[in-house]
Amino acid sequence: MPAFHKALLLFNPVSGAHLELRSTTMRRIAEIFQRSGVEVIAQATHARGSAGDQARAAISEGCDAVFACGGDGTVFEVLQGMAKSSAMMGVIPLGTGNVLAHDLRLTGNSERAAAQLLSFAPHRISLGRIETGGHTRFFTVAAGVGVHAELLYRANARAKQSGGHLAYYSQGARLLFRHAFVPFPVEITTSEGKAVETTALELVAMRVRSFGGPLRHWKPGSSLLSDDLRLVLLRNSNRAHMLRYTLQALTGLAPFDGLEKEDADLSFVSAKSVLCRVPEVRAAQLRVQADGELLGPAPTRIEIVPDALTLLIPPEAGWIGGPLTTQSVSL
């Protein structure tokens, strides 16, 4: 028997596949749940940013589970209405990239993923929370400051014109060799409660094991089941070193261990929080993102929030976890 009894299926009608095809897929997903005795409501999002409110409304009306059907953007929006609630959240990949679904080992086929979810179990997990630009949002995948967010900004703008995933790769190559990296001070509270101050050129706070896709082999030690953020800090702008590390990450050969060094190019830190203090004159030069969604300008505070979400995960999900340590490596 499924762990849930009344479910809301939320999907974005203007994202990915044609509306008619998407509606057909949603109907088939609903039928899979209904055959297992689940009461189902399938609902399109009303507008950009409405998914969180729709999730809250459904929970207040008796839904014990809400499923984000779509890509990373849909999951992010639904999450804002699910955080700190007691209802279960599930994800169903639908036509576009879905990093959380990949981390949960859900198949990319929407209908098969729905069938998998019937055997998933609810598990209370921690969430990341980011405060920037006067707003607070939750995330499940990653959040950060720096060139990777700039890449999202430029690639999204280019994709609107070209409509291809190659936008990300072409923009990434350009940024790697042309972008002027902006250093910013960071204040970290480690998992052990130690206060650390340093300077970074790039910061990513991860929660999932990997991003999937071309970076599926890059697993710096983060975990949905941990109560920590896994911080990845770049502290050296040597472009030859960055290119080498990028190639190593793509092939699964990137180092994640080594001796502690003050001049280390890359640091991996398990943390409870991190504050990125950016001088006002440089704030406009630094982009901020959470789960692939561009947010307001720095300064930014990122922290872990324990016991924040009931997520449907595979019944035997020990592979989601992993040891977390504080390490630095020179590239």
Predicted regions and their residues:
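ATP/NTP phosphate-donor binding region
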Residues: M1-V66, F76, E111-R112, G318, ...
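Catalytic core of DAGKc-family lipid kinases
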Residues: V14, R27, R35-S36, T45, ...
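ATP/nucleoside-binding phosphotransfer catalytic cores, i.e., glycine-rich phosphate-binding loops
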Residues: E20, S191-E192, S223-S226, L233-L331
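N-terminal glycine-rich "phosphate-gripper" loop used for MgATP/nucleotide binding
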Residues: A68-D72
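Short Gly/Thr/Asp-enriched flexible loops that form oxyanion-binding sites at enzyme active sites
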Residues: T74-A87
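Glycine-rich phosphate/pyrophosphate-binding beta-alpha loops
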Residues: G144, H148, V204-G221, E293-L294
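Gly/Ser/Thr-rich active-site loops/lids in small-molecule metabolic enzymes
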Residues: A159-Y169, F211-P214, K219-H241
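A generic structural signal for short beta-strands and their flanking turns/coil linkers
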Residues: V182-F184, T199-L201, L225-R230, S270-K272
